[in-house]
Amino acid sequence: MLLGTLQITGEEVRDAEVKAICDSLDDNSIRILSLRGCRVQDEDFKKLMESLKECESLIQLNLNLGVCNGKHRIKWLSEALIVNKCLNSLFLHGTSLGDEGLECLMPSFQVHPKLCSLDLGDCQLGDDGIKQICTLLPSTDGRDGLFELTLSANQNVSPKGWTELAIAIAAKSQLHCLYLDYNNIGDYGAGVFSVALAASSTLEKVDFEGCGIGERGGEMFFTVVANYQTKLDELVLFENNISAELIGQISDCLSHKSQECEERDTDKSHREDNDKAL
């Protein structure tokens, strides 16, 4: 059966539409649901969360731009995720979550067996919130670590919070993609994240656009990409105080390393084919 996708943006979701969505969730006939920026009555939101609990088909849920605002809605979402076992991507970008709201969601995040992509950008998180998120990075019994994490525009996070995240990434992280754009990271943060990038065996893309990083921070990133064997192939540094020349050098270095990796993979594949032929 071909599973459906439903995307509604910035509209009021009325009773008939809510019923249709709940029916699709109950019938396991929907794969992606996006209600980005939509207006949903409390009673209807609760119905959606009840249907989410037992749904076995939905893999991506987008509640960006305030759909989940309010302690009661966060509680209903958490209760749904405790039961749900199939969702792997949850987008809450632009939710008035704060550290307290995240704390309410954490028990469901920590036990969910398949949740691997999480967007908490512009969610008013602080250092306590970052500390909680760090617990989701390593794999545990019954749960893989996060594969993709978005923390854009959480400007209440201090250097201490970013340092904790960098340590968690360097230690046991499974992250492949990390989006930190439009945060107050600066050269100090660039330094601690440089250590994380050098230590990570999984990170492939990191976004530091508009993070107040200067030439000194850019030089630390260049040191990593030029001298350490990592899987990193994209480092976004636009809208910082880093010279175009240095950004170009970093980009060239990443491109060269990516080409070398492709050549190694091709050689390995050829060797394996030859071994099978023998």
Regions found by a protein language model. Give the residues of each.
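Leucine-rich tandem repeat or coiled-coil scaffolds
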Residues: M1-L278
